[in-house]
């Protein structure tokens, strides 16, 4: 019975890893399409926010993508608001209305997305502790807990399963 439970757990881990791998591939496709489009997305007025809020969120997203400031451990909504020449309340509202997340949730989602990509690279042997600090987490424990909450498994297990999946794919080809 214990062996069967262990096998089921491993099968679920593999399923999660496959889903994450598919998401990474879809993200790459979307990024390619976005970079090929004329200026990215167009602004429209939505029921959730106005054009100014969407424009502010777009600037915020651009800052995240181009400068990867989410990697800074001392990042705050106040610092970003100053950088974007707005106030913290308006920035927080723009983030919440356009992403459905709070500032800290958005920052952590950027960090976890990058961690997912790095840990998916089979030739990357960065230590989890070093990765946690590189991505702006205060401690490796916070990183691991956030990663597990988001992805469903610890970063070490995710890396191991990604490598296993990669090796299985190579063996079948």
Give short role names for the model-derived ranges:
Residues 8-109, 113-122, 146, 156, ...:
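Membrane-proximal linker segments that couple transmembrane helices to downstream signaling/catalytic modules
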Residues 122-158:
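Sequence-specific DNA-binding recognition helix
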Residues 1-7:
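Selective detector of the "anchor" transmembrane alpha-helix that sits immediately C-terminal
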